[in-house]
Every structure is written in C-alpha cells, then in structure tokens.
Amino acid sequence: MGKHYIPNSAHKDEMLKEIGFSSIEDLFSDVPKGMVKEFNLPEGKSEYEVFTELNETLSKNKTVLEMPSFLGAGTYFHYVPAHVKYLIERSEFLTAYTPYQPEISQGMLQALFEYQSLIAELVGLPIVNSSMYDWGTAMAEAALMSARVTKRNKFVVPKHLSPEKKLVLKTYTAGPGLETVEVPWDERGQMDIEKLKEAVEGAAGVYIEMPNFFGLLEENIREIGEIAHDAGALFVVGVDPTILGIVEAPGELGADIVVGEAAYFGNPMNFGGPRAGIFAVRNDRKLIRQMPGRIIGMTKDADGKRAFVMTLQTREQHIRRAKATSNICSNEALVAVAAAIHLATLGPKGVRELGEVILKNTAYLKKRLAEVGEIVFDGVNFKDVPVRFEVPYSVIHERLLERNIHGGYYIGKHFQELGETALFAATETTRKEWVDGLVDALREIIGEAEL
C-alpha cells in the first residue's frame, strides 16, 4: 500500500530530525549504560490474544450473586436499576471535566442541582454541596469546618467508629493539629452519655452516626446534640441515607452538619469505590461560607432565562489559599448524578420501602445468627450485626470461603475487647436462602472446630 499506518512513528522521526538525532537511543546516549535496563516483558500479542488472556483471568472472579456475601462495615450490595447505568454513560455526563463553563454545562449542572435538592429533602437540611469524595472525607472535612467556625481545636467522635474513617480523620487533622477525642460505648453498644459530657468541654464539634458502626440505632441522638450545643460545639451527624425513609431526618434531630455516603444509591460496590460524600448544613451564613466543595445554584442569565451555575467554589485554586475551605478538585460528580437518578426513581415511597426491607432482612439475619453465635449488643440493627464466636473467626471465615460463602468483617482486630467478633450484613438484596445457608455452614464449621 506504500503507507505505514499502525504503529506510525513518522511524527517521532520528524521531531528527532528537528533536534538533530537519528533515534531515541541517540537522544538518551548520555545516560550511563549500567543504568539502562531492558523491560522484562513478554513478546507482544494480538488484540484477540490479549482479550482471551484477560477473559481467562477475569473469569476467576466471583460476584455476590455467585458467592453470597455478608461482608458489611461500609460496603454493601445494593441493587442498581439498569437505567441508572445507561443514563450516566451518556456522553453528556460521562466525563472527568469539571463544569467550569456553565454556558456549555447546563445539563450536568442541573443534574447536580437536582442531587443537592434530593439530598436536602432526605437529610432535613437546606444547604447541600455537590458531593465530597466519600463519607470518610466528608466527616473529616466536617471536623475541620467545625474548628474553623468555632475557633476551637478538639473534635469528639465515638470510639465505635469505622477504622477506615478513623484513619482518614487522623490524616486530615494531622496538619492543622486538630485533637480528636474518642468517647467509649456503653453496655448497649451506643455512645456513653456520661463520658461524652466529660469529653465535650472546649470541643469544636461532636460526631455521631445513624446507624453506628455496630449497625445499631443510637437512641440518644437528640440528647447528644443538646449536649454538644450546650458546650458551644457543632453537632455533626453521619448517616447511611438508605435508612432515612424509616427514621427521623438528622436535620430534624438538631444536626448542624450532616455527612454520609451517597453512593449507596445508584452505584455498585466497585471494590469499595468510587464514592460520593454527602455534605449538608443548616441555613446559617457562618456555616455556608465555611463549607468545603462546591454548591450548584439556580439563577437567571442576561436574557432572564433560568440558568445553573457554581454558586460557591471556595477552593484554593480560585481564592487565596489561606481563605480556601478545601482543595477538592474534579470530585465524584458522576457518582452523585447516579445517586440522584436512583433517588428520583425511588421517590419517597420507594426510599421508605427500601429501608423497611433492609430492616426486615437484618432482623432475620440477626435472629438466625443468634442460633450459632452471641449477638454482642441488644438493640435495633440496620444492615450490620456484630456476632461473637467461641471459635477463632479466622478459622470460621476461611472455611466459609471454602463453602463459597463470604462471611462477615472481623472487627476483633480493631476492638480487642470484643474478642472473636465479626460484622455480618444484610441489605434489600439478601435472600432468605443465603442466610439459611450461612447459618447451616456456621453450625457445621463450629461443630467441627470444637471436636
């Protein structure tokens, strides 16, 4: 044909000629020979050969439909309607581009505005940003924001907090030197109110979750908020939004700031990410001006037509670094749009039904697990249930895997006082036969281990 198409090195040859070299090797000839290494790579393969090899490797993976999973502690199997994936894969949405030019980004900006509106209705607070990276970073940003607003240097959290969230909080607070104080749990697995009263003096903020890391619904959330406010601290509530159809919204319980995980709507597990952190505040100018991230607002253009814009974007790229409230860049907007599509599909009735089904499935899981282990705390559980065993959990987990079942998340390594305890989780996708199969397997494994 007379032309060399793929691979085509003509442009490289032209650049080399322009700078006076005949080859790439000549260009780097001053690099000592001893430092030049050959790539230890196999011979090249055709596209079909690569496809076949990757397909063979990927076929070893198992989905939660093939291998029932009870692994909770923050990542859960929720059903995502097919149209959600279809819509977010449209070219108008599927981009890493941040909509800095509102005149060409009205669709994405409106979708994010709808996300904010839906989350505001869900959490009971009017001001919501267009998402953070995930729940953990949203919580950590809330700690920093509390310190900026109150001019204090201490943030109070429950000891029974996700180990991953603790690490994120530690990372965020290390630079500014913000002290974090942990309040222990009581015999019910809930924040110890008396210990909180001792710890809250001089605090910038007090943080609590609904449900907590043990899957329990904290019964004293309103009282915790009052204790925080009496001490001059902000009250921060972290929430799993799938519960908000069946419990009172945190904004109605006195929360100043609400954080959480939006990716539980509209997004698959994806090995734990990407996510989208919820961040909402009450309508207070002091709080709004200190919010991290970006807020999408609705206004009118020069012709009087409705338009969507970035109302607040107090990032260090836009204003003086010392005045910036965050350095969040191209964040999890697509994940937030997916959450908005799913939420709009469910509506208030669907969100309530989702919460009811999860609560029912969790209760059945808890009832059956009580037959083979000790339910550590008495209370109402949502998704997660902590169960203690007499047999080392590492043995139980390994043998469950041999039976094609993924067991719970071992928390004894993080909370040694709980011993051989694991968190088992249920969602709306958990089938009765999966739970029955799990309990039968546990009974058999424990029996074998005790022989």
Swiss-Prot record:
Disulfide bonds: none annotated. Gene3D superfamilies: Aspartate Aminotransferase, domain 1, Type I PLP-dependent aspartate aminotransferase-like (Major domain). It comes from the Archaea. It catalyses: N(6)-[(R)-lipoyl]-L-lysyl-[glycine-cleavage complex H protein] + glycine + H(+) = N(6)-[(R)-S(8)-aminomethyldihydrolipoyl]-L-lysyl-[glycine-cleavage complex H protein] + CO2. InterPro entries: GcvPA, GDC-P_N, GDC_P, PyrdxlP-dep_Trfase, PyrdxlP-dep_Trfase_major, PyrdxlP-dep_Trfase_small. Keywords: Oxidoreductase. Its EC number is 1.4.4.2. GO terms for molecular function: glycine dehydrogenase (decarboxylating) activity. Pfam families: GDC-P. GO terms for biological process: glycine decarboxylation via glycine cleavage system; nucleoside metabolic process. The glycine cleavage system catalyzes the degradation of glycine. The P protein binds the alpha-amino group of glycine through its pyridoxal phosphate cofactor; CO(2) is released and the remaining methylamine moiety is then transferred to the lipoamide cofactor of the H protein. The glycine cleavage system is composed of four proteins: P, T, L and H. In this organism, the P 'protein' is a heterodimer of two subunits. PANTHER family: GLYCINE CLEAVAGE SYSTEM P-PROTEIN (PTHR42806), GLYCINE DEHYDROGENASE (DECARBOXYLATING) (PTHR42806:SF1). Belongs to the GcvP family. N-terminal subunit subfamily. This is Probable glycine dehydrogenase (decarboxylating) subunit 1. It comes from Thermococcus kodakarensis (strain ATCC BAA-918 / JCM 12380 / KOD1) (Pyrococcus kodakaraensis (strain KOD1)). The gene is gcvPA.
